[in-house]
């Protein structure tokens, strides 16, 4: 029995959130979540990459890399990681040019983190999970979009909490990343409550 698109989407956003369930993409999650505006921009960027890269990699895997896809008896699946990274690198370069042209302030704010999206583990993880679950092209698009929106929800929530924490009296030993890690852990516990949902 195949899952409905709504089930795949809700699972990707809430139940199997890339940042708060699998802890993927934590480098940018922690570094860019200081301001809601910046977190929103990065969240949109990651969502766009996931919505494009996951189904694109699905097509490449299904029609080229999978065993017997091109020729009977030929299995090119050992090339999947390097191929997926190549696709991500090309998409990130295109996205970087678009941001530099149309949103220069966001491009400047993201700075060094933009090229790192090529090997962003949440984006790469979504592609690997898509292959393992044998999603179709449309399911891959829904899953990639859901993963991106879930990651965006998590980073915006963290940024909002971090903005509020600026005005809090935090013990000296927990200031900085200490309280951020604790907050991420508590957010993760909150998202674990969705794991009981049967869709």
Swiss-Prot record:
It is a multi-pass membrane protein. It comes from Yersinia pestis. Composed of six subunits; NqrA, NqrB, NqrC, NqrD, NqrE and NqrF. Belongs to the NqrDE/RnfAE family. The chain crosses the membrane at residues 12-32, 36-56, 78-98, 111-131, 141-161, 177-197. GO terms for molecular function: oxidoreductase activity, acting on NAD(P)H, quinone or similar compound as acceptor. NQR complex catalyzes the reduction of ubiquinone-1 to ubiquinol by two successive reactions, coupled with the transport of Na(+) ions from the cytoplasm to the periplasm. NqrA to NqrE are probably involved in the second step, the conversion of ubisemiquinone to ubiquinol. It comes from the Bacteria. This is Na(+)-translocating NADH-quinone reductase subunit E. The keyword Transport applies. It is found in: Cell inner membrane. One of its GO terms (biological process) is sodium ion transport. Its EC number is 7.2.1.1. GO terms for cellular component: Gram-negative-bacterium-type cell wall; plasma membrane. The keyword Metal-binding does not apply. Keywords: Cell inner membrane, Cell membrane, Ion transport, Membrane, NAD, Sodium, Sodium transport, Translocase, Transmembrane, Transmembrane helix, Transport, Ubiquinone. Coiled coil: none annotated. It catalyses: a ubiquinone + n Na(+)(in) + NADH + H(+) = a ubiquinol + n Na(+)(out) + NAD(+). The gene is nqrE.
